[in-house]
Structure formats: C-alpha cells, structure tokens
C-alpha cells in the first residue's frame, strides 16, 4: 500500500497528550506503522557517558514514535487534519485532500 504520510509532511496529532499539536515528520517507520514527528511525544532518556566516543552522559530528550493512526496530514486550506486519497493526473499518482480535492504539496 502506498504511504499516505511521508517524510517532510506537516501533520497534526489526533489523540494523546500532544493532541492538537502540529509538527513535521522526520522519519517514517513503515514496518511498525509509526512516524517520528518533530517536537511531538518527547521522552527523556538517561544516557551513560562513553568516553571512547566522546559522548557525554546525562538526561537527553528525544522524540519517540507515534502510531500513524494517531496523526493526520495538516490541510493548510482548512486549518485542520485531513484524510488523503490517491488519483492519477497526467500519468502520475498524486495525493489529494479528501475534504476539498486540493493536491498535497
């Protein structure tokens, strides 16, 4: 199945503690059905120092993955999250917003 949400897409979170927040997709984990979104689902990790690699220890903040069903592509025309469909235009498969039919940029 084709990916409805891709890297660099702007998405809005539908559920959870970050509900309503927007961010840019930095990574798509296809096998797990998850995405990593900038500034969303930030977790703290206790990092041990590794002097051989020059890595300092401490508490590091890192974005954790969010299930793809908990985010929707942000439609700038409506200002809301929207569903995405596919259609062919000039022999190319393109994504479009289902609410107003505009192409996803």
From Swiss-Prot:
SUPFAM superfamilies: Translation proteins SH3-like domain (SSF50104). Coiled coil: none annotated. Gene3D superfamilies: 2.30.30.30. The keyword Ribonucleoprotein applies. Belongs to the universal ribosomal protein uL24 family. One of two assembly initiator proteins, it binds directly to the 5'-end of the 23S rRNA, where it nucleates assembly of the 50S subunit. One of its GO terms (cellular component) is ribonucleoprotein complex. InterPro entries: KOW, Rib_uL2_dom2, Ribosomal_uL24, Ribosomal_uL24_CS, Ribosomal_uL24_KOW, Translation_prot_SH3-like_sf. The keyword Lipid biosynthesis does not apply. GO terms for biological process: translation. Part of the 50S ribosomal subunit. GO terms for molecular function: rRNA binding; structural constituent of ribosome. Pfam families: KOW (PF00467), ribosomal_L24 (PF17136). It comes from Tolumonas auensis (strain DSM 9187 / NBRC 110442 / TA 4). Keywords: Ribonucleoprotein, Ribosomal protein, RNA-binding, rRNA-binding. CDD domains: KOW_RPL26 (cd06089). This is Large ribosomal subunit protein uL24.
């Amino acid at each position: 199945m084709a990916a409805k949400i891709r890297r660099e897409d702007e998405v809005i979170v539908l559920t959870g503690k970050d509900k309503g927040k927007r961010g840019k997709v930095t990574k798509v984990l296809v096998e797990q059905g998850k995405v990593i979104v900038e500034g969303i689902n930030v977790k703290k990790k206790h990092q041990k120092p590794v002097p051989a690699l020059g890595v300092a220890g401490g508490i590091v903040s890192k974005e954790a993955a969010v299930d793809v069903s908990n985010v929707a592509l942000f439609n700038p025309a409506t200002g809301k999250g929207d569903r995405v469909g596919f259609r062919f235009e000039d022999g190319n498969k393109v994504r479009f917003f289902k609410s107003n039919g505009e192409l996803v940029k």
